[in-house]
């Protein structure tokens, strides 16, 4: 494999499960409190150990569902990654920002375990379940940990712009990278009215469709997808022919 191609795949994503404490109407994975679909925990541990010992991989990312709902298990995975000298990144809805002491503990743990990026998903859809005050608490505490890059990801539609979210975060959002991205009709978002989608991407302009990630995603449904775009999950583009396939075969 050419060196340039090797560099594309220095990270891998593990989607641990569909369980979430929110039931957002735009969720690309249709996650909710009642969903039980998840990767087998022992197999996840084996996968993460395999990833951590693979010299090609530099970064292992964890997402869901909501990964902080089973914090002891998440912490055990972070320990595996950190013990191998690799780094972790996390995606969360930030529900744990409710209690200041919990926020302090989690940041101490993340800092010790080599977490370099924490992405918080919060927008008009998430805020129906997770108070924006909780996100503010996380952003304020994050200033004590400059080695952990915080970003806020805001899904938007024509009438749900996320502007009120940014306003309500106040000074806590200052200096924090914010990404606004348009909804696409996958998962639960298929049920949203068509006129809510901006449709800013077009197959007639392929230069707009460049993927910035190139991260294989080990999904809770057992498939391995070639990237993390929500659009990929409604296609036949999968990379595995067996469950819990090792990274080199992928």
What does each model-found stretch correspond to?
Residues 1-93, 97-105, 112, 117:
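Conserved alpha-helical substructure of the radical SAM core
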Residues 5-10, 49-55, 136, 140-143, ...:
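Solvent-exposed, well-ordered amphipathic alpha-helical segments
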Residues 16, 121-123, 228-229:
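Short loop/turn segments at strand-loop or loop-helix junctions that form parts
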Residues 39, 98, 130, 242-245:
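Short coil/turn linker and secondary-structure boundary residues
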Residues 65, 155, 229-230:
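Short, well-ordered beta-to-alpha junction loops that form the rim of enzyme active sites
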Residues 69-213:
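Conserved AdoMet/S-adenosylmethionine-binding subsite of the radical SAM
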Residues 182-250:
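Accessory C-terminal segments flanking Radical SAM cores
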């Amino acid at each position: 494999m050419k060196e340039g191609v090797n560099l594309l795949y220095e990270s891998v994503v593990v989607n641990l499960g569909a369980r979430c404490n929110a039931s957002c109407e735009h969720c690309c994975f249709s996650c909710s409190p009642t969903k039980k679909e998840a990767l087998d925990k022992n197999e996840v541990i084996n996968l993460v150990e395999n990833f951590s010992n693979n010299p090609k991989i530099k970064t292992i990312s964890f997402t869901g569902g909501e990964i902080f709902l089973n914090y002891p298990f998440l912490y055990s995975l972070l320990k595996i990654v950190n013990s191998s000298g690799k780094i972790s990144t996390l995606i969360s809805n930030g529900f744990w920002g409710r209690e200041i002491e919990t926020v302090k503990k989690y940041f101490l743990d993340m800092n010790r375990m080599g977490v370099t990026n924490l992405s918080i998903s919060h927008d008009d859809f998430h805020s129906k379940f997770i108070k924006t005050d909780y996100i503010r608490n996380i952003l304020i505490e994050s200033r004590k940990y400059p080695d952990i890059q915080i970003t806020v990801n805001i899904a938007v539609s024509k009438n749900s712009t996320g502007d009120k979210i940014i306003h309500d975060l106040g000074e806590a959002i200052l200096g924090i990278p914010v990404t606004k991205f348009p909804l696409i009709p996958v998962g639960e978002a298929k049920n949203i009215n068509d006129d809510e989608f901006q449709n800013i991407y077009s197959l007639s302009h392929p230069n707009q469709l460049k993927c910035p990630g190139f991260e294989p995603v080990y999904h809770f449904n057992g498939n391995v997808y070639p990237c993390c775009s929500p659009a990929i999950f409604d296609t036949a583009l999968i990379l595995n022919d067996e469950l819990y396939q090792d990274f080199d075969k992928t």
